[in-house]
Amino acid sequence: MKLKKALITAAATLLLFGAAVEASAETPQGEPMTKKILQTAGRDVLGKMAPDFARYNDDILFGEVWNKQDALSVKQRSMITVVSLVSQGITDSSLKYHIQNAKNNGVTLEEMADTITQVAFYAGWPKAWAAFRLVKEVYEIQ
């Protein structure tokens, strides 16, 4: 379990070092896919030490999973990622990054607040409080 959390935290932390986005077309449902995720952080940070992990991070997680254009939009994927991190109790800089990413992908403050309120009942009240502190920073709420 600790290894799993460490790997998830490492993957999320890698995001802090170089996820880039570019404009894209639309989903199969005709909704705009606002961004395409491009990632080199895995190779930049861990390329020589853990080349397989770096490749999975850059090519699979970001190259395929985040860019999959089917039923989920990038906005929805961002919200799911925030919920996943909060539910695991990961409330460090990786969660802050993903809250910022969600905001950049169109998640409003109201949507973020409702999402964290919902997950609080299943993941725990203290985790939600910790997440809300980061939401206030990202959305610049006093």
What are these regions (language model features)?
Residues 9-16, 21-75, 104, 128-142:
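Acidic, glycine/proline-rich low-complexity segments that act as flexible tails and inter-domain linkers
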Residues 118-120, 124-129:
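Substrate/cofactor-recognition hotspot
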Residues 74-78, 110, 123:
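Aromatic- and histidine-enriched alpha-helix N-cap/loop-to-helix transition segments
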Residues 84-91, 123-124:
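Short alpha-helix boundary/capping elements
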